[in-house]
Structure formats: C-alpha cells, structure tokens
Regions:
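Ferredoxin-reductase
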Residues: 2-86, 142
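FNR/FR-type flavoprotein reductase catalytic core
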Residues: 76-143
Length: 143
C-alpha cells in the first residue's frame, strides 16, 4: 500500500548539467519497495505544476532507510525539482507500480535498458544477484 510522506533531501549530486541524483530519508517507502517500483513527487508547494512527477527508484539502502532516484530535467516540473537543496523536504507517494518478479522461473536473466532508463534496472540487478542468478546486462547510450 503506497504511503505519502515528506522526505528530507540528504544528498544531491549533479551527474551531468541536466541529470541529478537525489538521496532522501524515506524509510517508510524503502521498507515496502521492490525493484520495479516508482515514486510520485510533488515538485512545488504552488498550484502549478499541478501533477506529481513519476520517477523510478534507482537504489534503496534498506539498512539506513535511504531512497535514491535519478532524473533528467525535461520541463518545468523536473526543473523545479532540480532546484531543491539538501535539507529541503520532498513530498513523495510510493511505492507505486508492479514490483513483482518471480526469479524461480529463470536460470539466466538479460537486463536491457538505454539512456536514463538504465537507472531503475540497478535494483533489479541487485536482487537478481541476491537470488544467485546469472545476469547479463545490455545498455545502450547516446554518444
């Protein structure tokens, strides 16, 4: 069942000029999330932009309750999000989506992704390793 929380931004990294990695304290979400889940983020306390932004979960530190997500600035909403500073609160709803994957059916896994879409595959690869599955990674990038 998704929860709505105010999470504290504890680390902000600019991976490129328009790509950011945020680390937030979100134990309530981390405790119930699985690979494949995502969160929805309210980017502003103002009326506009009205809609939350769906962002995939990159990494979950279950021991410390830290959730990490990576996003690319593509419009007004993600631009506002990129301006948040360490110490700010971020309004999150999550986990959302289908985080169910039955590893017992497979001996080998191929994880395929491209561009900004490779980041949510990290949690899937971590879980596959924990399940002792042989995992092949194919990633496409723009030059």
């Amino acid at each position: 069942m998704p929860v709505n929380i105010k999470a504290k931004l504890v680390k902000k990294e600019a991976l490129k000029k328009d790509v950011f990695k945020f680390s937030v304290e979100a134990k309530e979400i981390v405790d119930i999330s699985k690979p494949g889940h995502f969160i929805e983020i309210r980017v502003s306390d103002q009326v506009e932009p009205f809609l939350r932004r769906p962002i995939s979960i990159f990494n979950m530190d279950k021991e410390n309750g830290i959730l990490e997500f990576i996003f690319q600035v593509k419009g007004k909403g993600t631009d506002l999000l990129s301006k948040k500073q360490v110490g700010d609160e971020v309004d999150l709803i999550g986990p959302l989506g289908n985080g169910k994957f039955d590893y017992s059916k497979y001996q080998n896994l191929a994880i395929i992704g491209g561009g900004i879409g490779v980041f949510p595959l990290y949690e899937l690869a971590k879980e596959a390793r924990e399940e002792r599955k042989k995992c092949y990674h194919l990633f496409g990038i723009q030059k």
